[in-house]
């Protein structure tokens, strides 16, 4: 269908939007916006625009949704119409560099002259009066011209460096041109320098071997200042190391300073130890003697006597305060738990405790009363209560003995008194078994009484 120069193929949704089957969401949206602007009913007065606009909207809604688009693609594949209406999809992702070969205008770094040929003086045939263009838009063209000139200079200088040994003599008699004036001047200078050095080397045949080596090196490396940088080999390149060597340190002087410091520290430590021993000696002397009864009072000088006397008096007061201190007070306050011997600790399992355990083990657990032959309910209830009270008292006695047992303290010395501790533990286990037996009997009596009471 065609309306107002708009042709639409209504066979598929892809053909309605004019998009291939592999189109992206952006392409679908762009084509939808174009068609919507042209076919909108408000902008066109034809009758068929509303129907076409509905078709475009339906196509966009289905193709913009991934699930609906996948279902629609399956339907087209089954019908065999999936790739029939692609309308020449444009291949935008093309390799731009395909089929193009770029030539390298510049030489390698080792063959490039110093300054890249920009600062080389101009020849006589080149124009000296160059007027720069004032228009800023033409700066790129001027830069390109300078680049082309520099590349031509690189080519000429590289050719001269390859022919530095002068194999062809005919190259020296070439007519001057605009492109090779500078190259001829540089090559003539280089050849003249190399010839002079070779002549000096041939004339000095009877020299020492060291001088011969120096002359040979000069002959090999006979170059001009312009070609000196790129003719240098890798082995002869000047390279600064990443970590520069430090200046020579005076190690002996540093060690002597350290020794002096260590000796001072040792002297200070030795002085402190002597002072500490002197204080102890003075305290011992003041405990037995006093300052008034000492015979050495007249032998000590007056200045030293005042210092020693003040120290002795202060130390004597401190010693008088601490001399009456006794360790028995600590033992009396803390008790005998931490200051006891192992034998005293083993005697914690007293004989009375063992007797109580044995008495409880000898007592038999009373059998539960037979309440079935008693006809009256009150008699059954009284008999059951008496049994429970008696067993409760027995349980209290057993629990009291177990709670006050001293096996926990005796276990601290288990390595020496193993037999006594194990015997005591076995008796406690028997008491626990008896306690469980009493509990079972009480439970049976209570259950039977509850059944009979409830009927």
UniProtKB/Swiss-Prot annotation:
S-adenosyl-L-methionine is among the record's keywords: no
Bias-annotated ranges (Low complexity): 133-144
InterPro entries: DnaJ_domain, DnaJ_domain_CS, DnaJ_subfamily_B/C, J_dom_sf
All residue ranges annotated as the J domain in the record: 12-76
Cellular compartment(s): Cytoplasm; Nucleus
Recorded GO MF terms: Hsp70 protein binding
Positions of region (Disordered): 104-241
Record's compositionally biased regions (Basic and acidic residues): 156-168
KW rRNA-binding (keyword) present: no
Xref: Pfam families: DnaJ (PF00226)
SUPFAM superfamilies registered for this protein in UniProt: Chaperone J-domain
GO CC annotations on file: endoplasmic reticulum membrane; nucleus
UniProt GO BP: cellular response to misfolded protein; chaperone cofactor-dependent protein refolding
Record keywords: Chaperone, Cytoplasm, Nucleus
Stated name of the protein: J protein JJJ2
Source organism of the structure: Candida glabrata (strain ATCC 2001 / BCRC 20586 / JCM 3761 / NBRC 0622 / NRRL Y-65 / CBS 138)
């Amino acid at each position: 269908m065609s309306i107002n120069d708009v042709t639409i193929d209504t066979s598929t949704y892809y053909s309605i939007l004019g998009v291939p089957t592999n189109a992206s969401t952006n392409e679908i949206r762009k084509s939808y916006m174009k068609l919507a602007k042209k076919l909108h009913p408000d902008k066109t007065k034809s009758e068929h625009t509303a129907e076409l606009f509905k078709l475009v909207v339906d196509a966009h809604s289905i193709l913009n949704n991934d699930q609906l688009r996948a279902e629609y693609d399956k339907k087209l594949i089954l019908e065999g119409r999936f790739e029939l209406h692609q309308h020449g999809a444009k291949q935008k992702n093309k390799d731009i560099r395909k089929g193009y070969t770029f030539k390298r205008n510049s030489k390698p770094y080792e063959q490039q002259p110093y300054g890249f040929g920009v600062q080389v003086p101009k020849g006589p045939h080149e124009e000296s009066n160059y007027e720069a263009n004032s228009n800023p838009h033409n700066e790129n063209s001027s830069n390109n011209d300078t680049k082309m000139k520099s590349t031509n200079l690189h080519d000429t200088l590289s050719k001269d460096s390859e022919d530095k040994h002068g194999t062809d003599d005919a190259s020296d008699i070439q007519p001057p041109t605009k492109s090779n004036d500078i190259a001829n001047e540089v090559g003539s200078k280089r050849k003249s320098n190399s010839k002079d050095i070779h002549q000096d080397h041939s004339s000095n045949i009877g020299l020492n071997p060291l001088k011969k080596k120096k002359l040979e090196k000069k002959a090999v490396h006979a170059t001009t200042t312009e070609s000196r940088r790129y003719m240098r080999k890798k082995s002869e390149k000047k390279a600064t190391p990443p970590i520069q060597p430090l200046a020579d340190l005076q190690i002996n002087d540093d060690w002597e300073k350290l020794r002096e410091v260590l000796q001072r520290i040792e002297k200070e430590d030795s002085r402190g130890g002597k002072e500490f021993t002197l204080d102890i000696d003075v305290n011992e002397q003041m405990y037995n003697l006093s300052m008034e009864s000492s015979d050495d009072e007249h032998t000590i000088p007056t200045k030293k006597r005042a210092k020693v006397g003040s120290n002795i008096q202060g130390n004597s007061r401190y010693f008088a305060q601490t001399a009456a201190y006794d360790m028995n007070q600590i033992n009396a306050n803390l008790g005998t738990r931490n200051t006891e011997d192992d034998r005293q600790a083993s005697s914690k399992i007293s004989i009375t405790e063992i007797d109580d355990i044995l008495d409880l083990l000898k007592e038999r657990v009373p059998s539960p009363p037979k309440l079935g032959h008693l006809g009256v309910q009150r008699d059954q209830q009284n008999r059951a209560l008496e049994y429970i009270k008696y067993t409760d008292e027995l349980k209290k006695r057993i629990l009291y003995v177990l709670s006050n047992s001293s096996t926990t303290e005796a276990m601290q010395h288990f390595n020496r008194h193993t037999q006594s501790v194990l015997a005591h533990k076995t008796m406690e286990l028997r008491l626990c078994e008896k306690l469980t037996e009493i509990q079972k009997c009480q439970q049976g009596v209570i259950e039977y009484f509850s059944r009979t009471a409830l009927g």
